[in-house]
């Protein structure tokens, strides 16, 4: 045994390391040095300040917070499982290396904020949005309640923290969804705050510890296999606190953004395309049937932004939009005719199974596919005059052989997402797609073609049980 490392492990474990502990943990000696040297008093002070600023309604006392922190940093002394020791060291290392910069900084005075004057009045466009959604309100309601509706009482506290976090970390964290639209139009109501960031795992682990230390309750982090790079933080009752998608820095750089009140939001034109896509998912149409007013305000806000920014004239002239698709049910591939626009491709092969697209890209011997991760939920490849891509939602049919207009619009929007993220001009097709929302009759759904089935196990980080499976 190296005497210096053995002494370090003895100090950390509160006991002489066994031979097995020494050999398994000796390579962790640098992390253990950081943990031992970490100033717990300053850390406890930051936790208390975070509590005062964002969780003042929680009753835990300063003494209880201190006890909770010190207890966790000595947890290894009563742990003999090598696997659990590895977990404790990993999580403690994340805390001592990142907490101050990620969440501790939120307690300091921030930079001056320059309130945005960008606000949108939707009165003139709300009737168009109402009519558009009325035509799309064609789902038959089921009794199934999606997990996203089970909301933790901690959400309002975390939202306050997230607003500050988005301002301080706006180079690597941006928001989308209802909160971003609330910044444009206060009429939009929001629940939790939807975010994309480049350090999602670290942020959520730090936040999980903050909640644990100031509430005294355990929280867990789940990684869902059918959503790429997605993690959700849940409380002890399995209620949703916050979720986050992780993206690469390269993806972050190509996302068009708008700065509002020192917070970057995903450009609403891109969000409108995502909303078009969303409506092809049958459970989202059920949401529309349950609460049309909520979606009306959101759609109207997005449409008004696009109308103003892109000079869209709302006259119902939709030209080639939505682009038409033909479904091969056996191959689960839709061929979209894109020849009406000046794209770099004349048609688009839309795959309903991601593995089939990946296989065909390999067969094409192409190495220039682009993947925008959760922003598009698909890779794209242009080869010859064909765009190859994957569509992750259900496809609706209006009769046995005809794709419903809702799904044609969704796939058209998916194609425009590629055009937006690759920096191409989208003014004409965007104008046409928005105008295709006007003057539509309600057409019932004949059949729902199911989306790609993703398999895999949920990953979990459980601080209380010293478990990391992702």
Swiss-Prot record:
The keyword Nucleotide-binding applies. Keywords: ATP-binding, mRNA processing, Nucleotide-binding, Transcription, Transferase. CDD domains: polyA_pol_Pox (cd20919). InterPro entries: PolyA_pol_cat_Poxvir, PolyA_pol_cat_sf, PolyA_pol_nucTrfase_Poxvir, PolyA_pol_nucTrfase_sf_Poxvir, Poxvirus_polyA_pol_cat_C, Poxvirus_polyA_pol_cat_N, Poxvirus_polyA_pol_cat_N_sf. Pfam families: Pox_polyA_pol, Pox_polyA_pol_C, Pox_polyA_pol_N. One of its GO terms (molecular function) is poly(A) RNA polymerase activity. Its EC number is 2.7.7.19. It catalyses: RNA(n) + ATP = RNA(n)-3'-adenine ribonucleotide + diphosphate. GO terms for biological process: mRNA processing. The active site is at residues 192, 194. The keyword Nucleotide-binding applies. Heterodimer of a large (catalytic) subunit and a small (regulatory) subunit. Polymerase that creates the 3'-poly(A) tail of mRNA's. Belongs to the poxviridae poly(A) polymerase catalytic subunit family. This is Poly(A) polymerase catalytic subunit. The gene is PAPL.
């Amino acid at each position: 045994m190296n005497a210096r490392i053995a002494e370090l492990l003895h100090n950390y474990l509160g006991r002489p390391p066994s031979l097995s502990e020494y050999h398994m943990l000796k390579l962790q000696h640098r992390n253990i040095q950081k943990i031992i040297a970490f100033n717990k008093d300053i850390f406890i002070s930051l936790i208390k300040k975070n509590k005062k600023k964002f969780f003042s309604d929680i009753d835990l006392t300063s003494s209880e917070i201190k006890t909770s922190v010190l207890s966790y940093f000595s947890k290894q002394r009563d742990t003999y499982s090598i696997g659990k020791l590895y977990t404790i060291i990993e999580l403690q290392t994340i805390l001592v290396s990142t907490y101050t910069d990620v969440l501790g900084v939120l307690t300091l005075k921030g930079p001056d904020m320059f309130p945005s004057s960008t606000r949108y009045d939707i009165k003139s466009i709300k009737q168009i949005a109402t009519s558009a959604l009325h035509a799309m309100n064609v789902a038959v309601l089921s009794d199934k309640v999606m997990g996203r509706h089970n909301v933790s009482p901690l959400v309002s506290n975390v939202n306050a923290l997230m607003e500050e976090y988005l301002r301080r970390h706006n180079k690597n964290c941006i928001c989308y969804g209802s909160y971003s639209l609330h910044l444009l139009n206060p009429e939009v109501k929001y629940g939790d705050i939807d975010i994309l960031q480049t350090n999602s795992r670290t942020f959520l682990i730090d936040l999980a510890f903050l909640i644990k230390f100031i509430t005294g309750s355990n929280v867990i982090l789940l990684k869902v296999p059918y959503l790429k790079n997605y993690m959700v933080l849940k409380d002890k009752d399995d209620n949703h606190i916050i979720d986050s998608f992780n993206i690469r820095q390269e993806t972050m750089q190509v996302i068009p953004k708008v700065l509002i009140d020192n917070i970057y939001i995903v450009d609403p034109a891109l969000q409108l395309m995502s909303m078009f896509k969303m409506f092809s998912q049958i459970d989202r149409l059920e949401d529309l049937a349950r609460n049309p007013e909520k979606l009306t305000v959101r759609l109207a806000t997005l449409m008004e932004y696009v109308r103003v920014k892109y000079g869209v004239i709302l006259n119902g002239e939709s030209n080639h939009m939505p682009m038409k698709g033909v479904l091969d049910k056996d191959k689960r591939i839709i061929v979209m005719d894109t020849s009406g626009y000046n794209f770099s491709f004349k048609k688009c092969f839309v795959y309903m199974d991601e593995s089939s697209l990946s296989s065909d890209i390999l067969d094409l011997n192409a190495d220039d596919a682009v993947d925008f991760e959760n922003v598009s939920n698909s890779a794209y490849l242009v080869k010859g005059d064909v765009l190859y891509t994957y569509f992750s939602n259900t496809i609706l049919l209006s009769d046995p052989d005809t794709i419903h207009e809702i799904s044609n619009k969704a796939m058209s929007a998916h194609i425009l997402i590629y055009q937006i993220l690759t920096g191409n001009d989208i003014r004409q097709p965007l104008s046409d797609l928005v105008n295709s929302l006007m003057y539509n009759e309600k057409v019932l759904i004949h059949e729902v073609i199911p989306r790609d089935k993703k398999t895999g196990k949920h990953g979990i980080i459980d601080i209380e049980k010293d478990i990391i499976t992702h």
